[in-house]
Amino acid sequence: SVGFKAGVKDYKLTYYTPEYQPQDTDILAAFRVTPQPGVPSEEAGAAVAAESSTGTWTTVWTDGLTSLDRYKGRCYHIDAVPGEDNQYICYVAYPLDLFEEGSVTNMFTSIVGNVFGFKALRALRLEDLRIPVAYIKTFQGPPHGIQVERDKLNKYGRPLLGCTIKPKLGLSAKNYGRAVYECLRGGLDFTKDDENVNSQPFMRWRDRFLFCAEAIYKAQAETGEIKGHYLNATAGTCEEMIKRAVFARELGVPIVMHDYLTGGFTANTSLALYCRDNGLLLHIHRAMHAVIDRQKNHGMHFRVLAKALRLSGGDHIHAGTVVGKLEGERDITLGFVDLLRDDYTEIDANRGIYFTQSWVSTPGVLPVASGGIHVWHMPALTEIFGDDSVLQFGGGTLGHPWGNAPGAVANRVALEACVQARNEGRDLARQGATIIRNASKWSPELAAACEVWKEIKFEFPAVDTLDKKKG
């Protein structure tokens, strides 16, 4: 037969193309590749391109029925990782026709599918994606975005304040609603369902939604401010999830919530579409992310999950704290925080950004700082995250010695003091502790909080760090 030669041939003969110039419409991926001993970097990079696009382990005669040159992924550039003996950043370009429009699910099934179990590689990590403008425009993106959210809430010029209700499991709906009310009347903008609060025997979802709505309306009437509680609509089926979102809308509350990784991108995109059509804000929790993103040499970096969320849809997403109890190196964290909020981000190796990314006016997502933070962290958080963020204090509100409402007062006073000091041109990084101490002189609630948490720190080295040359 003409043009078909059976057998196995090296991937690099077809899929390693250093002369290729990436197209504006290509999806570009940066993979951290650790080949097995004896496997050259070109073969490893080509194998990744092949297995995540049109290739398989042997030549097949049906290759002749299509144009492989049109559809194949191409490994077009390889950099050795500084400080590592056998690790490479392999850049792969994928033609846009390989992907279904508006489907994060399909994009990930191709790019981070079977290839991650490939035997020729010891480890593989997807570090970054460049999503082309042509593909971004097939997604709705966040239901509303940062500016529309501020307009809905009538809150400007400062970060928003939140609190996760604790204990996360075990409260009855009535007591849960009471905790929500105390936090909101004390000065918080939002309270939050914990990510694992769905509809358990001790508190069914419908009861929780009702008592939380009552708490919201009561707190709004007392404070004159718009309040919200992230009602977790995550459920065992998509139909049940939408049913819960519909009930939230009927109650007239402003925001619902979804666990986007455990719930899945298909469910998340459906919920985001519903939220846009029905005026609901959508808070996103990233439960399960560390299973995927914590190891430096295998898995997928959170910046990729963040980009995927901006495509799929969400108005808030948890993004680490830099200063609290959960993983997050400052430069890396700020890199993906900007990817969430900004319309255009330049390539920047110092922040782990491998590609220049334009979002063509896709709404931005508010990063949420949450996990082990308290009033002494407020100056650093205000400086690091800026106004367009949500600062969430769970234990840092509910752990106040006088109760929830005073805990909320302490956080609000600390935030307002930091914002005022920043607006006056003071250096929050250097003068933060002084700013908090001065504010506590006229707020007994803040003074009590300062006393409780004055010694608490979570200081461990980050696992996921930038690559630096040895020596």
Swiss-Prot record:
Gene3D superfamilies assigned: Ribulose bisphosphate carboxylase, large subunit, C-terminal domain, RuBisCO large subunit, N-terminal domain
Key word Plastid present? yes
Instruction: Supply the HAMAP family for this chain.
Output: RuBisCO_L_type1 (MF_01338)
NCBIfam families attached to this UniProt entry: PRK04208.1 (NF003252)
As for what it does, the entry says: RuBisCO catalyzes two reactions: the carboxylation of D-ribulose 1,5-bisphosphate, the primary event in carbon dioxide fixation, as well as the oxidative fragmentation of the pentose substrate in the photorespiration process. Both reactions occur simultaneously and in competition at the same active site.
Q: What is this protein called?
A: Ribulose bisphosphate carboxylase large chain
What further note is attached to this protein's record? The basic functional RuBisCO is composed of a large chain homodimer in a 'head-to-tail' conformation. In form I RuBisCO this homodimer is arranged in a barrel-like tetramer with the small subunits forming a tetrameric 'cap' on each end of the 'barrel'.
One example of the protein's molecular function in GO is: monooxygenase activity
Q: Where on the tree of life does the source sit, at the highest rank?
A: Eukaryota
UniProt-annotated catalytic positions: K166, H285
Site (Transition state stabilizer): give the residues: K325
Q: Which UniProt keywords apply?
A: Calvin cycle, Carbon dioxide fixation, Chloroplast, Disulfide bond, Lyase, Magnesium, Metal-binding, Methylation, Monooxygenase, Oxidoreductase, Photorespiration, Photosynthesis, Plastid
Q: Which organism is it from?
A: Schlumbergera truncata
Q: Which family does it belong to?
A: Belongs to the RuBisCO large chain family. Type I subfamily.
**Biological processes, Gene Ontology terms:** photorespiration; reductive pentose-phosphate cycle
Residues with the modification N6-carboxylysine, per the entry, are K192
Binding sites annotated in the UniProt record for substrate = N114, T164, K168, R286, H318, S370
Task: Tell me the compartments it is located in.
Answer: Plastid, Chloroplast
Pfam families, per the entry: RuBisCO_large, RuBisCO_large_N
